[in-house]
């Protein structure tokens, strides 16, 4: 389950991400009622066995039961899970089957559950895989200007729809060649590469997310400020 919200006095609208049908929205009738078994079942980060009916964009949920126990996401890992859910909700078209992304999603959540407060590698890996699914083709290994292989000691500036071009300009869009090589390998073992990867994915995902802020990011920021 990616997200849920009230619908009428007794029901819920539920956004789901499924292996065979992709992302879809279902109406869970009576799920808000006091005696409804669905209320406790429809929780984030719980693998579910589902059944639904309907041919319109809004399906009717007819069955939901846990397929396994909920992944124990806490603190930073919990907010990271909400972020991943929101990414899928915002950028993946409804009812577009993508079994590989579903497996990547499960792998990401499992990694978050294991790492808890060290979440950055799992998030960056998922973001890169998501960009690949979206058809975001960028060559990390060659300069877009000259076609030459990137030099690990040189700097390259990212230009949307073109790629990375050798540049002496130093700003938020500039990356070392060694960082680009690590991006290609999805090797985020070094702290500097992790930081660079975060800069890149924020830029690369922006065309898909638009200007609307991510609610999960705002919630995390508000929580940190409250704790301070």
Curated annotation (Swiss-Prot):
UniProt protein name: DNA repair protein RecO
UniProt record similarity statement: Belongs to the RecO family.
Domain of life of the source: Bacteria
Entry-linked InterPro entries: ARFGAP/RecO, DNA_rep/recomb_RecO_N, NA-bd_OB-fold, RecO, RecO_C
GO biological process: DNA recombination; double-strand break repair
Protein's organism: Mannheimia succiniciproducens (strain KCTC 0769BP / MBEL55E)
NCBIfam families xref list: reco
Keywords associated with the record: DNA damage, DNA recombination, DNA repair
Role of this protein: Involved in DNA repair and RecF pathway recombination.
Gene transcribed to yield this protein: recO
Cellular component, GO annotation: bacterial nucleoid
SUPFAM superfamilies in alphabetical order: ArfGap/RecO-like zinc finger (SSF57863), Nucleic acid-binding proteins (SSF50249)
């Amino acid at each position: 389950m990616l997200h849920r919200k009230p619908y009428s006095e007794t029901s819920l609208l539920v956004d789901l991400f499924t292996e065979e049908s992709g992302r879809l929205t279902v109406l869970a009738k009576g799920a808000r009622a006091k005696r409804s078994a669905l209320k406790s079942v429809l929780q984030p980060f719980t693998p579910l066995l589902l059944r639904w009916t309907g041919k319109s964009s809004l399906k009717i949920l007819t069955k939901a039961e846990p397929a396994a126990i909920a992944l124990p996401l806490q603190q930073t890992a919990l907010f990271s899970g909400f972020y991943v859910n929101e990414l899928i909700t915002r950028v993946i078209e409804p009812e577009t089957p993508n079994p590989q992304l579903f497996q990547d999603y499960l792998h990401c959540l499992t990694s978050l559950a294991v790492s808890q407060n060290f979440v950055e590698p799992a998030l960056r890996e998922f973001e890169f895989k998501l960009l690949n699914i979206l058809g975001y083709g960028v060559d990390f290994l060659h300069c877009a200007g000259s076609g030459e292989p990137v030099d690990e000691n040189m700097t390259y500036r990212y230009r949307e729809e073109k790629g990375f071009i050798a540049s002496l300009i130093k700003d938020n869009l500039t990356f070392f060649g060694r960082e680009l090589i690590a991006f290609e390998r999805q090797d985020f073992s070094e702290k500097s590469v992790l930081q660079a990867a975060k800069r890149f994915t924020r830029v690369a995902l922006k065309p898909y997310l638009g200007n609307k802020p991510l609610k999960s990011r705002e919630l995390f920021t508000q929580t940190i400020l409250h704790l301070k």
